[in-house]
């Protein structure tokens, strides 16, 4: 059974690919003598009235497909407006015509939109599945006409009589569907509430017949526009054969398979190949591509960010359909990205239109002929700049930022005005205002203040700018070289120097444009959270509790973010467009999900990427739910004070150290705040001597700050002369029975083992104070990122992390703490899946090395 299922899945992948390869091979043979350039010239020479009528019929054909959705609405009694049904239908069907595998592209879209309008999702799944399968019923009706010779195809398939079996097979779909529907009606007749979903089979048959009739009309009119006045019965017969081939091929939209079969069929009837190919191109434009572009407009308007999140996180884009099909998974990914980026795609097309208008010859005599030539050249350079901005901007427009909206409107208006002033361009004059109006209507979708760019996105933007500018020079230069002898001077703006001037202007204007908007919106954006407030922090930690890193909030180099219920707190710093949260939330555990969700939402809205530094294993599942990956930074050493003792054979080394310092009359002291200035000054001298030429670190590491040291007790060792030789500040963990340590510093002439002696005495003191656990701080693992199976990103991140110049040797730290036989607990970095781990680690180490004023 499993082997059969795997074989079927493989066949579903291989079959469409094989069909595509066959179509490509066969098309190459058939179209060897065809000039695509000549085809475009023929289309360009057609009567505008014929083109308009063809596009209108194509739009009406796609609109007619909304009958399916209206049948679905009334059969399931969906509480949705007719206008919304029409838009959903247009999006689903136009995307189906381009991307659909036998109608599956529309299944997920319909499910996503309609599930909000019914409580019976099971009935909706069945209804959509019924709708999708009913799209074959109309083709089955026409197949019956073919089999009955009402639509003659004998001349087309006389060389391949086996095709009759395929036609008859499709003809049988209608009676079989009617039979199955009748059986279901009988079974449902005995069930309670059986009339809830009425049998819409005949309504679907009518809708399907209208769909295929309209589609056939489009291609018939395309042939008519090319001067092929064929018998409509023969055209529809060939159309039905080609449509069956397109459906069987499973190729998205039937591209290639339908087109090739229709071409071969019409050639069998004696019509000229070039005219047929041009007709097929016109058919695709009118029935597929133009409705698809209009579908993008509808999608951009109807698909809000929340809707897209539901689609993207939906584990099954096509419920009740086998989701293990790799083709469906790939199609789902493509469909989601196209829908989410529909507006970006439209703006990108606008950029291409403006770029084309800049590259092509300009007829100066048609619009504003009295503009001075220097001004005309200025407008040309500004048009090029607008085009390049519109090509780059979709990267940020995809993120729906307010800045991208303003920039897009500015660039579109600029592109329209400058294109108009420098010369007549039909596409720019008619298309750009439509896109501007669309953007204005969708203004409410742009809710984010800013958006952070990944390194890859920045590189892509620069590469796109460079390639577009290069292509402008290439195309415009080619046109100038080929056409300068043909066009009169007054009709032409371009020359080699004009192209160079426009390029230089764009190189200056485009970066300046982005810089200005970045600065303006950066100043408008209010910072997240609030500045460090020691009094509020102390009150919060004493009431709600904290963790091993909460006390570092008193350093003043981090901002605070409180949950809306006031029961949870995050400490964080900022580096570039990253917000680095130190440790897990402090406060009541029940409010951790709330504070994380609120913080991440606000950071997302203001364009920041968030990472969490030194989180514990206990809450990793919570971060994973928010889409985070993890990298193990190291481990914290916890000494169990209940079992800590200096007695026994295994503790002989520690006992010897303690006894030596007692013999040498070293004394241990713990003082509580407030501390005198003289005491802190003495500690400052020790700290400066210990630092030497090194710079203080911060964020996750304490630094010598009098106000910070006044917040907790300080333990120190004095020699026989009464001089302080080493000290460490006690760091409360705001958890019952737990205590930690932060700064650990000693004089340069302190004897060996002084820090061991200090720790031993601190353990004994903490035990007397009723503490049960002593946190000695974090030490990295020597093998993090060095295993053979580690990813390269982890290896590189480990190199960065382990070689930053901290106060202590990391390998020495671990060896120092290991002698106390602690329990090691993992510490992790939580970072976004779409962010570079190496870059993230580099930014974290930079943040740790920043000064206090630069971190908040």
UniProtKB/Swiss-Prot annotation:
Q: What GO MF terms are annotated?
A: aminoacyltransferase activity; phosphatidylglycerol lysyltransferase activity
Say which domain of life the source belongs to: Bacteria
Recorded catalytic reaction(s): these are: L-lysyl-tRNA(Lys) + a 1,2-diacyl-sn-glycero-3-phospho-(1'-sn-glycerol) = a 1,2-diacyl-sn-glycero-3-phospho-1'-(3'-O-L-lysyl)-sn-glycerol + tRNA(Lys)
EC number(s) per entry = 2.3.2.3
Work out whether the entry's keyword set contains Disulfide bond. no
Q: Please give the SUPFAM superfamilies that the UniProt record associates with this protein.
A: Acyl-CoA N-acyltransferases (Nat)
Cellular localization per UniProt: Cell membrane
Q: What are its GO cellular component terms?
A: plasma membrane
**Pfam families xref list:** LPG_synthase_C, LPG_synthase_TM
User: Does the record bear Cell membrane in its keywords?
Assistant: yes
UniProt keyword list:
Antibiotic resistance, Cell membrane, Lipid metabolism, Membrane, Transferase, Transmembrane, Transmembrane helix
- Gene Ontology biological process terms, A to Z: lipid metabolic process; phospholipid homeostasis; response to antibiotic
Q: What is its main location?
A: membrane
> What is the reported phenotype of gene knockout?
Cells lacking this gene lack lysyl-phosphatidylglycerol in their membranes. They also display an increased sensitivity to the antibiotics nisin and daptomycin. Cells appear normal, no effect on flotillin cluster numbers or size.
Identify its membrane topology class. Multi-pass membrane protein
Q: Which InterPro entries match?
A: Acyl_CoA_acyltransferase, L-PG_synthase/AglD, LPG_synthase_C, PG_lysyltransferase
Residue intervals passing through the bilayer: 7-27, 51-71, 88-108, 128-148, 161-181, 208-228, 235-255, 280-300, 342-362, 375-395, 420-440, 459-479, 501-521
Per the entry, what this protein does is: Catalyzes the transfer of a lysyl group from L-lysyl-tRNA(Lys) to membrane-bound phosphatidylglycerol (PG), which produces lysylphosphatidylglycerol (LPG), one of the components of the bacterial membrane with a positive net charge. LPG synthesis contributes to the resistance to cationic antimicrobial peptides (CAMPs) and likely protects B.subtilis against its own CAMPs and against those produced by competiting microorganisms (bacteriocins). In fact, the modification of anionic phosphatidylglycerol with positively charged L-lysine results in repulsion of the peptides.
NCBIfam families, per database record: bifunc_MprF (NF033480)
* Family the UniProt entry places it in: Belongs to the LPG synthase family.
What name does UniProt use for this protein? Phosphatidylglycerol lysyltransferase
Species in which this protein is naturally found: Bacillus subtilis (strain 168)
The taxonomic lineage of its organism, from the top, reads:
Bacteria, Bacillati, Bacillota, Bacilli, Bacillales
This chain is encoded by the gene named: mprF
């Amino acid at each position: 059974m499993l082997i059969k299922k795997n074989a079927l899945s493989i066949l579903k992948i291989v079959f469409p690919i094989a069909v595509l390869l066959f179509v490509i091979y066969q098309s190459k043979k058939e179209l060897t003598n065809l000039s695509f350039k000549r085809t475009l010239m023929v289309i360009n020479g057609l009567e505008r009235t014929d083109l308009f009528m063809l596009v209108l019929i194509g739009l009406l054909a796609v609109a007619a497909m909304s009958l399916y959705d209206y049948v679905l609405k009334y059969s399931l009694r969906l509480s949705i407006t007719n206008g919304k049904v029409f838009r959903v239908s247009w999006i689903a069907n136009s995307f189906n015509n381009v991307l659909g595998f036998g109608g599956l592209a529309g299944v997920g879209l319909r499910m996503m939109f309609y599930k909000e309008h019914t409580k019976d999702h099971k009935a909706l799944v069945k209804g959509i599945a019924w709708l999708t399968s009913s799209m074959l019923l109309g083709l089955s009706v026409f197949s019956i006409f073919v089999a009955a010779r009402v639509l003659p195809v004998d001349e087309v398939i006389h060389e391949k009589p086996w095709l009759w079996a395929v036609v008859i097979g499709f003809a049988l779909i209608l009676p079989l569907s009617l039979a199955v529907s009748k059986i279901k009606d009988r079974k449902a007749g005995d069930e309670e509430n059986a009339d809830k979903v009425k049998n819409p089979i005949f309504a679907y048959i009518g809708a399907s017949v209208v769909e295929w009739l309209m589609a056939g009309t489009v291609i018939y009119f395309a042939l008519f526009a090319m001067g092929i006045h064929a018998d409509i019965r023969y055209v529809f017969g060939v159309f039905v054969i080609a449509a069956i081939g397109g459906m069987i091929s499973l190729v998205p939209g039937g591209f290639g398979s339908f087109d090739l079969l229709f071409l071969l069929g019409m050639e069998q009837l004696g019509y000229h190949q070039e005219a047929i190919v041009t007709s097929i191109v016109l058919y695709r434009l009118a029935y597929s591509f133009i409705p698809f572009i209009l579908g993008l407009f509808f999608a951009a308007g109807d698909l809000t960010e929340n809707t897209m999140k539901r689609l993207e996180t939906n584990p099954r884009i096509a419920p009740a359909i086998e989701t293990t099909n790799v083709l469906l998974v790939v199609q789902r990914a493509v469909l989601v990205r196209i829908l989410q980026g529909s507006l970006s795609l439209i703006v990108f097309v606008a950029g291409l239109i403006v770029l084309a208008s800049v590259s092509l010859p300009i007829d100066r005599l048609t619009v504003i002929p009295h503009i001075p030539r220097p001004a005309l050249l200025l407008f040309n350079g500004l048009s090029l700049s607008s085009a390049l901005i519109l090509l780059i901007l979709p990267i940020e427009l995809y993120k729906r930022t307010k800045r991208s909206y303003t920039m897009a409107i500015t660039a579109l208006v600029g592109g329209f005005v400058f294109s108009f002033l420098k010369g007549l361009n039909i596409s720019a004059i008619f298309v750009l205002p439509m896109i501007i109006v669309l953007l204005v209507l969708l203004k409410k979708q742009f809710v984010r203040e800013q958006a952070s760019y990944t390194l890859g996105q920045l590189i892509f933007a620069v590469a796109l700018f460079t390639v577009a500018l290069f292509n402008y020079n290439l195309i415009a230069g080619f046109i100038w070289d080929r056409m300068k002898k043909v066009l009169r001077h007054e009709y032409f703006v371009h020359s080699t120097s004009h192209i160079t001037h426009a390029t230089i202007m764009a190189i200056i204007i485009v970066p300046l444009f982005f810089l200005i908007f970045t600065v303006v919106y950066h100043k408008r954006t209010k910072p997240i959270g609030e500045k460090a407030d020691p009094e509020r922090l102390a009150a919060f930690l004493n009431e709600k509790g904290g963790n091993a890193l909460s006390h570092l909030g008193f350093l003043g180099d981090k901002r605070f973010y409180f949950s809306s219920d006031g029961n949870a707190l995050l400490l964080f710093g900022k580096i570039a467009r990253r917000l680095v949260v130190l440790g897990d939330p402090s406060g009541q555990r029940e409010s951790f999900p709330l504070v994380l969700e609120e913080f991440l939402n606000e950071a997302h809205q203001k364009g920041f990427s968030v990472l969490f530094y030194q989180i514990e294993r206990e809450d990793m599942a919570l971060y994973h739910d928010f889409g985070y990956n993890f990298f193990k930074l190291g481990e914290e050493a916890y000494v169990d004070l209940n079992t800590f003792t200096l007695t026994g054979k295994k503790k002989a080394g520690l006992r010897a150290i303690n006894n030596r310092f007692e013999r040498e009359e070293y004394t241990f002291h713990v003082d509580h705040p407030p501390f005198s200035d003289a005491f802190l000054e003495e500690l400052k001298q020790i700290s400066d001597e210990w630092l030497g030429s090194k710079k203080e670190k911060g964020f996750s590491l304490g630094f010598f700050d009098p106000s910070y040291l006044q917040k907790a007790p300080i333990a120190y060792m004095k020699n026989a002369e009464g001089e302080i030789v080493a000290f460490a500040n006690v760091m409360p963990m705001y958890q019952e029975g737990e205590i930690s340590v932060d700064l650990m510093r000693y004089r340069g002439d302190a004897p060996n083992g002084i820090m061991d002696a200090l720790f031993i005495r601190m353990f004994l003191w903490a035990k007397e104070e009723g503490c049960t656990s002593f946190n000695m701080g974090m030490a990295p693992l020597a093998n993090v990122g060095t295993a053979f199976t580690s990813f390269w990103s982890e290896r590189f991140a480990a190199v960065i992390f382990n070689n930053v110049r901290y106060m202590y040797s990391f390998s020495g730290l671990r060896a120092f703490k290991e002698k106390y036989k602690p329990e090691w607990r993992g510490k992790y970095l939580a970072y976004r899946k779409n962010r570079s781990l190496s870059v993230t680690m580099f930014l974290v180490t930079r943040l740790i090395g920043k000064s206090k004023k630069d971190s908040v």
